[in-house]
């Protein structure tokens, strides 16, 4: 077996795009016959969870592309710039809307990306 360290694997995965990571997960699921789906937990009391969630202000956001709108080419350009994806991958992401463009972004960066996508003609949501 090659002398590849865990750190090298982690470093390689860190540099992958969201689309590449999704493809990797699918391949691993097929190869090992497993599922990456999280197990469903027993639901807690809804009143307590809602109060705690409202008390905490969210500091990381996911930018979700709801639809590309009429100016799909402009939206693809913004997606490419934001994600570093190639043209085909960015087009597939835009065509597959709703799609998460970027995850766990700081609020200011997420709002800036949302603004850029909306200016390009897309419908965007922050989660």
Swiss-Prot record:
The keyword Plastid belongs to this UniProt entry's keyword annotation: no
Gene3D superfamilies: 3.30.1390.10, Single helix bin (1.20.5.710)
Keyword annotations: Ribonucleoprotein, Ribosomal protein
Record-linked InterPro entries: Ribosomal_bL12, Ribosomal_bL12_C, Ribosomal_bL12_C/ClpS-like, Ribosomal_bL12_oligo, Ribosomal_bL12_oligo_N_sf
One GO CC annotation: cytosolic large ribosomal subunit
Keyword Acyltransferase listed: no
Swiss-Prot/TrEMBL GO biological process terms: translation
GO MF: mRNA binding; structural constituent of ribosome
Subunit structure, interactors included: Homodimer. Part of the ribosomal stalk of the 50S ribosomal subunit. Forms a multimeric L10(L12)X complex, where L10 forms an elongated spine to which 2 to 4 L12 dimers bind in a sequential fashion. Binds GTP-bound translation factors.
Family, per entry: Belongs to the bacterial ribosomal protein bL12 family.
Function comment: Forms part of the ribosomal stalk which helps the ribosome interact with GTP-bound translation factors. Is thus essential for accurate translation.
Name of protein: Large ribosomal subunit protein bL12
Lineage: Bacteria, Pseudomonadati, Thermodesulfobacteriota, Desulfuromonadia, Desulfuromonadales
